[in-house]
């Protein structure tokens, strides 16, 4: 499904997407929204723990084991700016390997991943960063856009601090309601929303 969206609508769409927590009720098909220059791709919709969720006794989890449904991925969003050939990931989920392949159509994020935005420190939103470390991909200075509190958490706690020390990621602070211009036709405005906030 393809629709034309304005910059304002993109901001609203991102805000809504980032504020929603989904459980077993998920869409069955990939959804993509695009304009001529900027497209948004939903790369995952499942809650932090994946599918089936550990300890889940809901029908959807039980059916997953017994019927072998196709893999559903943890929440993530991809943004592509075709005018500048730039690609951004919202969240670094445990499924980051597959999600980057879906977004970039390549399994090498250093070739064309221009940044990762993290919304908060729940495991399904940042645990995929581990794949950027030296035990796996050993990336080079992938821009990581975070609120100051999240940046402090990453730079002060292992194993995340190693990503910063080894320059696998490069921290970039973003601020509530302050526009982050990525290109002349694309910017993101982070919005704080009520949500559990352990870190």
Give residue ranges: language-model regions.
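C-terminal motif of bacterial Sec signal peptides marking the signal peptidase cleavage site
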Residues: 20-23
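Binuclear metal-dependent hydrolase catalytic cores
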Residues: 26-199
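Bacterial N-terminal signal peptides that target proteins for export
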Residues: 2-12
